[in-house]
């Protein structure tokens, strides 16, 4: 091997070696750069099309306007949102739980905001409340250490009070202080005492559909912004 070829070979080997050494750091940096400051995990209401729904959009828009300078990512919980409440909400809970755990693992510095409207609120209940089976719903509790990564929980028109006679702030010891459980006056979905599956008319009542117009979606965002 000539001296020139030897130098070229040695240089190539050194570049390869240094590249191998620094590749993991480069990959880690790329992942860190891709992690948002804040991630909203939001579950839409019954029969709304895939996405975060009308209340979710209002909530996210308001939150972004209040945390300017910070990146805000959004994850729409992937679930049927069908009128088969127990089965559908349980699927949503498992999807939300799995996504939150993945975010905590891959982006430990990201502050997570959980949210849900109507049936979507129930999906969030199932991952944050005391894990007790009720009316066919399947709890999907998050690991205790996840709570440190969750900045706030905001639920709207939450049927939990209807089913168990108490809001999420009462039945979720780990998340109570960081939770806003919002119910419009006269909303039959989140009013206590019924202990029955909401009817179609109740789900589409004027009160239950008023969370954007009433300003409660923005109020929930203000609560969340104050905890990020």
Residue ranges and their predicted role:
Residues 1-32:
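Fungal secretory targeting signals
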Residues 3, 13, 53-54, 137, ...:
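Secondary-structure junction/capping motif
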Residues 21, 85, 142:
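Generic anion/oxyanion-binding catalytic loop in active/binding sites
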Residues 23, 31-34, 68, 144, ...:
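Sterically constrained small-residue positions within well-ordered secondary structures
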Residues 25-47, 85, 151-163:
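Short, charged N-terminal helix-start/capping segments
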Residues 33-111, 185-228:
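Active-site catalytic motif of lipid deacylating hydrolases and related acyltransferases
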Residues 94-115, 119-176, 180, 189:
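Serine-dependent carboxylesterase/thioesterase catalytic core
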